[in-house]
Amino acid sequence: MTIFSKIIAGEIPSYKIAENEKFFAFLDIFPLREGHVLVVPKTETDKFFDLPDEFLSEMLLFAKPIAKAIERSFNCNRCGVEVVGLEVPHAHMHLIPINSANDLNFTKDKLKMTPEQMKKVQETIVGNL
């Protein structure tokens, strides 16, 4: 069972943004930028393009209102989408408020945010859904 499956099951706490029968979205606890959200299928699949075809389109449709809420919540030009999949063997996409390509640089130091800051970000995004 991956760490994402444990988060989905409620075994590990998270800052949930949205959920439906197939997908779960929550704040990345090691964000590149404030408002960095992970969108994860509830079906545990290692590689993104090993997901069933219908999941790929449904995942984007699930992510779209979250991306729009991120854009409304933070000072950014757009919500960037990144699929990397090297750290956790569970397909997922990153939704990140960006102003330039450098904002998607995963080699940069991650933000250190307090639980209070994370909760405020969660409430802001959810409030803009």
Tell where the protein language model's regions lie, with residue ranges.
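HIT superfamily nucleotide-processing domains
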Residues: 1-129
